[in-house]
From Swiss-Prot:
Subcellular location: Cytoplasm
Sites annotated Could be important to modulate the pK values of the two catalytic cysteine residues: H168, E217
Residues in the signal sequence: none
Annotated GO MF terms: diaminopimelate epimerase activity
Catalytic activity: (2S,6S)-2,6-diaminopimelate = meso-2,6-diaminopimelate
Binding site for substrate: N14, N67, G77, N78, N166, N199, E217, R218, G227, T228
PROSITE patterns assigned: DAP_EPIMERASE
Protein name stated in the entry: Diaminopimelate epimerase
The protein's role, per its UniProt record: Catalyzes the stereoinversion of LL-2,6-diaminopimelate (L,L-DAP) to meso-diaminopimelate (meso-DAP), a precursor of L-lysine and an essential component of the bacterial peptidoglycan.
GO cellular component: cytosol
Amino acid sequence: MSQFSFTKMHGLGNSYIYVNMFEEQIPEEDLALVAEKVSNINTGIGADGMILICPSDVAPVKMRMFNNDGSEGKSCGNGLRCVAKYAYEHKLVEDTVFTIETLAGIVTAEVTVEEGKVTLAKIDMGAPRLTRAEIPMLGEGETPFIRENFLYNNHRYAFTAVSMGNPHAVIFVDDVEQAPLTTLGPVLETHEMFPERVNVEFIEILNEEEMNFRVWERGSGVTQACGTGACAAVVASILNGKMERGKEITVHLAGGDLMIAWTEEGNVLMKGPAEVICRGVYEYKIEA
């Protein structure tokens, strides 16, 4: 029987099991199965996945994230805010501004601290990727993929594709509560045009500075929030002429609000909370 200490944290209800790999050891070959086991709501702790906080050669810390199906993702906005909180509060970093390595690249985090606790984290998510090769999508072309039709159940849905280090398909609807989240979501997620699968967002524009947001996450299904998805939604809204670049947009997710801005300089900034749920020790056994 093996075990490791963990901290369960959430960003707007998007919860992960966080493991400090500066102190813990999980064999590389076991990571996918451990992520699946620990995320199981019935036989594990229950979460949207597992995130490892690891040493890095190019930044103070490195984030590796695994979905609850065991697949490894390249980035996670809500996860990055929680990693920033953990790293600062556990003295893995000294300054309130620092970098975090991800499989999608290096991002910059800035934490707001009150009485030694991080109350808010802002992440510079970098520039969005908009070509088919960068997303990735099948097909050729260097222009952004904006409002292309997808036929499902005799209805045409127009989506815009954006990568924030992971792929997103953003669909505008009149009412997110009536959106085909659990039906169209998994169909588009696994469509052959997306070789690495895709996260699917449904967006309801409220005004020039607010939107409602629901998400079907690649490898996790319906979740309360998706930070990279919120970033992709704002980028897609600006590409479609629905919002103005440079303004801070309030994204209303099922779990709460994020503040997102696509700056004139090109990067996307995400600001929001990160919370600790509980801490403990998880025991597991890998069958031979």
